[in-house]
Regions:
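Flexible, active-site-adjacent loop/turn segments at secondary-structure boundaries
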Residues: 31, 58, 112, 121-125, ...
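Transition-metal
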Residues: 1-109, 169-185
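Active-site glycine-rich loop that binds ribose-phosphate moieties when present
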Residues: 109-139
Length: 185
C-alpha cells in the first residue's frame, strides 16, 4: 500500500465533509457554508467566492513514493474540466530520516526532453529534490511538477479541486494524462 490520504475538510462534490455533532449534525459542509457564508468564510472570502468553500484540506501519509504529478491553473482547469485549478501548500508533520520530496525542476528543460524523460523513466533526474523535516513548508503553485516521497506525513491545504495529472508513476501500472500543457514554459 502506498499510504493514506484523508480529506479532512472538503466541499468537493462527492467527497463533502459532514458535520459530526451539534445542531447541524449530518449536514454537508457545502450546505452549511451556503447558509452561513460570512460567519464561516469571513466577509472578504465570502465576497470573493460566494457560497463556495475555496479550500480543501488533507492529511497525506506516504509510505511509498507517490506519483509525480502536476495540476492545471484556474484557466486551464476551467477550460478542460469546468473546475478550479489547484495550487497547494504542504506542511510537513513527520518525516523519516532522509525523507525527501520533489518540487519543480533543477533547470529549464524543453518539451522534447520532458517527454523523453517521462517515457524513459529518467524524469526524477531533472526534478528539484528537497530533503525534509517536520515543520518544513512548501508552496506549490499550479503548474509546478511535484511528488511526495515515502516516509513523509503532511498536511495539505489546496484549492478546492480534484484535478490532477499524473506524469510518472515509477513504471507501476498507471496512466499518463495531459500534464505537459499545465507546466509553464
Amino acid at each position: 500500500m502506498w499510504g493514506t490520504e484523508d480529506w479532512t475538510v472538503s466541499a468537493v462534490p462527492g467527497s463533502e465533509s459532514e458535520v459530526a455533532n451539534g445542531p447541524w449534525e449530518g449536514m454537508k459542509l457545502p450546505e452549511l457554508v451556503s447558509k452561513y457564508p460570512v460567519e464561516i468564510l469571513g466577509r472578504k472570502v465570502a465576497e470573493a467566492y460566494g457560497n463556495q468553500l475555496p479550500l480543501l484540506t488533507k492529511i497525506i501519509d506516504a509510505q511509498k513514493d507517490l506519483s509525480i504529478q502536476v495540476h492545471p491553473n484556474d484557466e486551464m482547469a476551467q477550460r478542460e474540466h469546468g473546475k478550479s485549478g489547484k495550487s497547494e501548500m504542504w506542511y510537513i508533520l513527520q518525516a523519516d530520516q532522509g525523507a525527501h520530496l520533489y518540487a519543480g525542476f533543477k533547470q529549464a528543460i524543453s518539451p522534447y526532453e520532458y517527454q523523453n524523460r517521462v517515457e524513459d523513466g529518467s524524469i526524477t533526474e531533472v526534478l528539484a529534490d528537497h530533503q525534509v523535516q517536520a515543520g518544513d513548508v512548501f508552496y506549490l503553485p499550479a503548474g509546478r511538477v511535484h511528488a511526495i516521497c515515502g516516509g513523509i506525513r503532511l498536511a495539505e491545504v489546496q484549492q478546492s479541486s480534484d484535478v490532477t495529472y499524473r506524469i510518472f508513476d515509477y513504471n507501476r501500472p498507471a496512466w499518463m494524462e495531459s500534464p505537459a500543457s499545465s507546466i509553464p514554459s
